[in-house]
C-alpha cells in the first residue's frame, strides 16, 4: 500500500464516523489506490492521444468523467 493510512482515517471521519478501525482505513486505501491507478492510466492515454507526455489536471478530470 502506498497511501498513508492517517489521511484515509480523516476522510472516513469527515464523512461522519466517530471511530475508524485500522481494517476500515486499509480497505478504503486499497479501493482508492485501485481507482486512482485506473484514473491515472486513463489520463495518460488521454495525454498521449493529445500528443503530450505531460498529464494535465484536465486529463485527470476527463478520465474521471469517463468512468
UniProtKB/Swiss-Prot annotation:
For this chain, the family text in UniProt reads:
Belongs to the archaeal histone HMF family.
- UniProt lists the gene as hmtB
One Gene Ontology CC term in the entry: chromosome
Gene3D superfamilies membership: Histone, subunit A
Cysteines engaged in disulfide bonds, as pairs: none
Q: Which SUPFAM superfamilies match?
A: Histone-fold
Q: Where is this site: Interaction with DNA?
A: 13
Question: GO molecular-function annotation terms?
Answer: DNA binding; protein heterodimerization activity
Please state what the protein is called: DNA-binding protein HMt-2
Instruction: Tell me the SMART domains matching this sequence.
Output: TAF
Q: What does this protein do?
A: Binds and compact DNA (95 to 150 base pairs) to form nucleosome-like structures that contain positive DNA supercoils.
Which keywords does this Swiss-Prot/TrEMBL entry list? Chromosome, Cytoplasm, DNA-binding
Which positions are tagged coiled coil?
Answer: none
